[in-house]
């Protein structure tokens, strides 16, 4: 394989799409309308070093004039005859564009096909070259517009209306010509339609909760044999890891079951998925078998990586290629399946040139056609003929100019084929006729399709008595046994042909169409209606007859509308969503049930909350909310919720209850419901139900303009000068109110909820509840879960740290050491400035989290595991020292946490206890490492943390470990190095010599 990376010049904006024209050209389209046509062979020669980069340049170039400066060219497709370009508001066509460029023209004329109205946006444009139908997907309203690209004016033949909540985002075209079109919608559904050339459609399959797509411009293609449907970012068949996505291949012949899964790297969403137009095969010489497979190239919407997969093995051919720092906007294969072209967002054209040995031998198209014939094809759409006759001339035609109308008559009336373009939504039968020399040359450039036409019996009913007067139109039924697999050829011969000549021509052709003429009496309810000039016309309600139901008058889809399912998370972790067979039955309340509490709650349903990875509960709106000051319990913030609007706003008061009667310090009105309130040292904060924060000082002045979070708030806590806010989608904010700044970038609590365990394939499940979420006086967020784990957020490391774990409760000797005598502060300890002795004796944050862990273990009945731990694990062989290892691990974690929290008194006690424990257990190397860590920066006499000097701390530890003989060698070395040995804490050498010792 060779890779050519070529930066494009002369294209303003970003390159958005690629188009290959046979095996000759590749068209590169820029967002600002700059279009370049490159010769594929020149790119391949450059990739294989057969020519230099200096000679590489585009073959042709022209500019697509945008009507609006804000519009961008995002869609492109076509062939040699016509090129279709589209923006998010309009679609245009360039007929004969390549011939004009080859003739030397640089300015081409385009024709408007479709333009949106009001606020509608085009989400995708697809072209079926076999059916000659252009699909335009729009929102507001959600529709699929179908345009006939064979006609000169590219007229719209029909449109498919979708549910207003099912916004079509992208479509997938069937390359086999079987007439299926797949749509991926915003409500995670996949809808498959069966469509014929006249625009008649029928919904054949709808898969709900299958795919997660966003408002992006996706590019998805099917394999050439069209036996499976690729679905990107599927909700089915994923590996279950958090943030992982998968591409699944749905077998169309087995009711769209998952036949294979392609799992890319974690936390990536596929944007481009293109199948090679060829099938490949490799022979296994050892087993004597031949393996056939498809190749598909995928790329994500976040990085510039490209992967090429073998669909048979479900594995990529090679590791992901990170070829660009920006995202890949589009990819396309050459017609021979040996070259892959890609463009990135930074305007670089990539050419992957493969050899035959790299990918495998290509399968001939005849064998691919045989595989297409084996696909299960849906029943054909309803079929009907429209026959019109006039004085002296009988015209037999099918709607939309489809098929060949033939009539047999004994008289000498002249018959011909005609086109009826005014009738819409009429079903037709597809018949074929050998291509004549008089046909348009525009079809000569297209390859002929192998057609399987069904045998039809056409009966023309005439009355011999009425022939002399005029010809009456009669409906003719046609029975079809099989859907045609190719495009029908139109009969455009304008020569006058008699009935005998037409009969002979049909019998000699290879179209297997038998035509018989029989005379029938006209039924009373199918009479023709004569116009004033004598012409005979058929009522529109009578000239459309289904082959199965003759009374069918409209062949549009009759699929009923359904209400979209709810995406709420079930309360039971293992329960699947079930339908309520009894309906909304009223359940009786048990006698001992508590009386319900009335809350003022509007129950907002927000899409960004419903589809978020984290969904936290929010407090219900209460009538009254009281919040006391952290400094003085007599200062009270009282909130009275009104009606949530301007007519009766919410009243916010700050009351001083130290005097009688109570005094109002300030009062404010908020035209919203208030859900939470908190207080700091010198500020008050409250939040509304829609996620707006209001912050006041003690006299009622707003310190900061109202902060808009956008979603309801689940936690609102304050301590000192810091304010903590956790939204219902898991976003965590921490502000320094004194400086009006964000303390650290916005983070999330998603890592705390065990996403790798709690993510399910089918539905989201509930994680552990968050029992506490607060902030320390130094601005460190802390959180506890219902399983007993406690965490703190390190703003320097920008990640969550584990503080307390239930595992340490089982094995550590110093777990929940509130009453441990070694940790009680000495009486000689003096409080620092601004800190009382009462605060020193209080339990630290680590001890608080350990208490919460104990409470959760007790609540869940897991305390009994402590006895089981001592009775079973400690007595097993190989686990004799597990208790001391768990104890040291617990002490080390507490040391590191208190160091980051800057709790100097707790840190002193813990490090002293830790050093003594190391000495008692004989961990000499670890004790030596502890001393080295403390004095590693002692030359500048700096503090380890504010208030703790490094040398003084080492002196304290040396004194505590002086009586431990097993570590005296370490303590003496460090005491001598720091100058404590001769005159301070150990012994006096001179006094010992005088006494003779």
From Swiss-Prot:
Q: Which residues lie within the region annotated Disordered?
A: 408-584
Membrane-spanning residues where?
A: none
Q: Name one GO cellular component term.
A: HIR complex
Molecular functions (GO terms) = DNA binding; nucleosome binding; transcription corepressor activity
The principal localisation class reads nucleus
The WD repeat ranges on this chain: 10-48, 117-152, 153-194, 274-319, 323-362, 665-706, 708-745
Supply the Pfam families for this chain: Hira
Biased composition range(s): Polar residues: 409-446, 491-501, 539-567
Which GO annotations describe the biological process of this protein?
negative regulation of chromatin organization; negative regulation of transcription by RNA polymerase II; negative regulation of transcription by RNA polymerase III; nucleosome assembly; transcription elongation-coupled chromatin remodeling
Protein origin, superkingdom: Eukaryota
Localization annotation: Nucleus
Keywords for this protein: Chromatin regulator, Nucleus, Repeat, Repressor, Transcription, Transcription regulation, WD repeat
Q: Where is the composition biased (Basic and acidic residues)?
A: 464-480, 518-538
Q: Gene3D superfamilies, alphabetically?
A: YVTN repeat-like/Quinoprotein amine dehydrogenase
- Note the PANTHER family from the entry: MEMBER OF THE HIR1 FAMILY OF WD-REPEAT PROTEINS (PTHR13831), PROTEIN HIR2 (PTHR13831:SF1)
What's this chain's function? Required for replication-independent chromatin assembly and for the periodic repression of histone gene transcription during the cell cycle.
Q: Say which family it is in.
A: Belongs to the WD repeat HIR1 family.
Q: Kindly provide the name given to this protein in its UniProt entry.
A: Protein HIR2
From which source organism is this entry?
Answer: Candida glabrata (strain ATCC 2001 / BCRC 20586 / JCM 3761 / NBRC 0622 / NRRL Y-65 / CBS 138)
Q: What gene is this protein a product of?
A: HIR2
């Amino acid at each position: 394989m060779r890779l050519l990376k070529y930066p494009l010049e002369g294209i303003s904006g970003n390159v958005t799409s690629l188009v290959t024209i046979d095996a000759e050209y590749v068209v590169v389209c820029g967002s600002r309308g700059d279009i370049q046509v490159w010769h594929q062979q020149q790119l391949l020669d450059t990739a294989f070093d057969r020519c230099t980069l200096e000679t590489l340049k585009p073959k042709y170039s022209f500019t697509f004039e945008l009507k609006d400066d804000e519009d961008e060219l995002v869609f492109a497709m076509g062939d040699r005859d016509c090129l279709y370009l589209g923006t998010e508001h309009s679609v245009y066509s360039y007929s004969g564009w390549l011939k004009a460029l080859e003739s030397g023209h640089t300015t081409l004329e385009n024709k408007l096909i479709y333009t949106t109205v009001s606020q509608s946006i085009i989400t995708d444009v697809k072209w079926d070259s076999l059916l000659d139908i252009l699909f335009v997907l729009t929102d507001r309203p959600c529709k699929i517009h179908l345009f006939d690209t064979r006609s000169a004016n590219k007229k719209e033949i029909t449109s498919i209306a979708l549910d207003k909540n099912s916004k079509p985002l992208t479509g997938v075209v069937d390359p086999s010509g079987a007439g299926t079109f797949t749509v991926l919608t915003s409500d995670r559904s996949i809808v498959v339609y069966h469509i014929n050339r006249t625009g008649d459609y029928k919904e054949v399959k709808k898969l709900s909760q299958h795919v997660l797509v966003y408002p992006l411009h996706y590019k998805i293609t099917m394999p050439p044999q069209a036996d499976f449907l690729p679905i990107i970012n599927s909700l089915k068949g994923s590996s279950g890891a958090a943030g992982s996505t998968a591409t699944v291949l749905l077998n169309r012949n087995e009711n769209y079951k998952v036949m294979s899964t392609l799992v890319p790297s974690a936390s990536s969403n596929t944007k481009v998925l293109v199948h090679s137009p060829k099938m490949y095969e490799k022979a296994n010489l050892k087993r004597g078998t031949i393996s056939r497979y498809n190749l598909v190239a995928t790329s994500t919407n976040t990085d510039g990586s490209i992967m090429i997969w073998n669909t048979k093995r479900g594995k990529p051919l090679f590791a992901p290629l990170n070829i660009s720092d920006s995202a890949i906007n589009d990819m396309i294969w050459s017609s021979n399946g040996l070259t892959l072209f890609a463009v990135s967002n930074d305007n670089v054209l990539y050419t992957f040139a493969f050899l035959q040995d790299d990918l495998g031998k290509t399968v001939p198209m005849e064998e691919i056609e045989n595989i297409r014939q084996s696909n299960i094809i849906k029943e054909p759409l309803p079929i009907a003929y429209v026959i019109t006759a006039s004085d002296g001339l009988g015209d037999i035609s099918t709607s939309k100019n489809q098929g060949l109308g033939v009539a047999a008559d004994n008289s000498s009336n002249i018959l011909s084929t005609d086109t009826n373009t005014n009738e819409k939504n009429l079903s037709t039968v597809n018949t074929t006729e050998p291509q004549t020399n008089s046909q348009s040359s525009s079809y000569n450039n297209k390859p002929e399709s192998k057609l399987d036409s069904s045998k039809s019996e056409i009966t023309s009913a005439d009355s011999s008595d009425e022939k002399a007067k005029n010809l009456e139109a009669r409906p003719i039924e046609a029975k079809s046994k099989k859907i045609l697999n190719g495009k029908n050829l139109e009969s455009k011969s304008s020569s006058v042909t008699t009935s005998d000549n037409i009969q002979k021509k049909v019998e000699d052709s290879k179209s297997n169409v038998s035509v018989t003429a029989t005379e029938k009496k006209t039924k009373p309810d199918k009479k023709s209606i004569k116009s004033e000039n004598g012409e005979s016309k058929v009522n529109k309600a009578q000239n459309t007859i289904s082959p199965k139901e003759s009374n069918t008058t409209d062949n549009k889809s009759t699929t009923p509308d359904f209400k979209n399912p709810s995406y709420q998370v079930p309360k039971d972790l293992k329960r699947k969503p079930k339908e309520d067979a009894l309906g909304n039955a009223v359940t009786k309340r048990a006698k001992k049930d508590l009386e319900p509490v009335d809350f003022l709650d509007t129950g907002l349903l927000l899409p960004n909350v419903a589809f978020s990875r984290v969904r936290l509960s929010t407090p219900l709106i209460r009538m009254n909310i009281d919040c006391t000051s952290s400094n003085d319990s007599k200062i009270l913030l009282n909130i009275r919720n009104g009606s949530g609007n301007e007519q009766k706003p919410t009243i916010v008061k700050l009351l001083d209850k130290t005097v009688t009667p109570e005094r109002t310090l300030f009062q404010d009105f908020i035209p919203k419901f208030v859900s939470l309130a908190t207080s700091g040292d010198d500020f008050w904060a409250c939040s509304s139900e829609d996620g707006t924060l209001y912050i006041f000082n003690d006299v009622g002045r707003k310190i900061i303009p109202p902060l808009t979070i956008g979603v309801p708030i689940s936690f609102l806590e304050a301590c000192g000068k810091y304010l903590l806010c956790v939204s219902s989608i898991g976003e965590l904010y921490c502000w320094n109110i004194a400086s009006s700044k964000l303390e650290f970038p916005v983070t999330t609590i998603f890592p705390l909820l065990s996403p790798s365990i709690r993510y399910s394939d089918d539905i989201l499940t509930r994680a552990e509840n968050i029992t506490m979420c607060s902030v320390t006086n130094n601005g460190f967020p802390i959180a506890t879960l219902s399983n007993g784990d406690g965490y703190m957020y390190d703003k320097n490391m920008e990640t969550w740290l584990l503080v307390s774990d239930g595992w340490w409760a089982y094995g550590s000797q110093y777990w929940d050491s509130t009453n441990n005598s070694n940790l009680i502060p000495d009486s000689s300890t003096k409080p620092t400035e601004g800190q009382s002795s009462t605060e020193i004796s209080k339990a630290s944050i680590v001890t608080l989290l350990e208490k919460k862990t104990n409470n959760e273990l007790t609540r869940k009945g897991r305390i009994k595991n402590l006895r089981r731990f001592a009775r079973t694990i400690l007595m097993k062989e190989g686990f004799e020292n597990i208790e001391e290892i768990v104890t040291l691990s617990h002490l080390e974690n507490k040391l590191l946490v208190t160091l980051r929290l800057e709790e100097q008194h707790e840190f002193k006690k813990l490090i002293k206890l830790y050093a003594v424990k190391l000495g008692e257990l004989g961990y000499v190397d670890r004790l030596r490492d502890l001393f080295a860590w403390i004095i590693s920066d002692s030359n500048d006499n700096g503090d380890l943390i504010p208030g703790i000097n490094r040398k003084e701390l080492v002196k304290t530890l040396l004194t505590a470990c002086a009586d431990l003989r097993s570590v005296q060698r370490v303590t003496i070395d460090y005491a001598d190095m720091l100058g404590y040995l001769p005159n301070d804490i150990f012994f006096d050498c001179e006094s010992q010599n005088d006494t003779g010792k």
